[in-house]
C-alpha cells in the first residue's frame, strides 16, 4: 500500500478557513489554529444572533408603537387590546412603520381602538 501524503488536502482546508477569517484582526486572520477558532466562534455568534435579531426587532417595534400610542393618549397594552376588540389585524411591524412615517393614519387607528375600548 503506497504512502498517503496529505499536503494538498491540508493546504486546501487551511486556505478555506483562512479565506473565511479574512478581515479579522491580527493572528485571527493569519494563523490557522487561531483563525479556525475565530471562524467557529463567529459561526456560533451568527447562529445566536439570527435568532436574537427577531426578538430585538419585535422589541423595537413595540417601543415605537408604545411611544406613538402614548402621544395619542393610550398605553401600548390598552392600544393592542383595543385593536383586538375592533378586529383590526395589523402586525406590529406595520404598526411601527405607520407610527414613524404615517402619523395621521396611526392616529386614526388609535381612535378606532379607543372607540372599541369604550
From Swiss-Prot:
GO terms for cellular component: ribonucleoprotein complex; ribosome. Binds directly to 23S ribosomal RNA and is necessary for the in vitro assembly process of the 50S ribosomal subunit. It is not involved in the protein synthesizing functions of that subunit. It holds the Pfam family Ribosomal_L20. It comes from Marinomonas sp. (strain MWYL1). GO terms for molecular function: rRNA binding; structural constituent of ribosome. Belongs to the bacterial ribosomal protein bL20 family. One of its GO terms (biological process) is translation. This is Large ribosomal subunit protein bL20. Keywords: Ribonucleoprotein, Ribosomal protein, RNA-binding, rRNA-binding. NCBIfam families: rplT_bact.
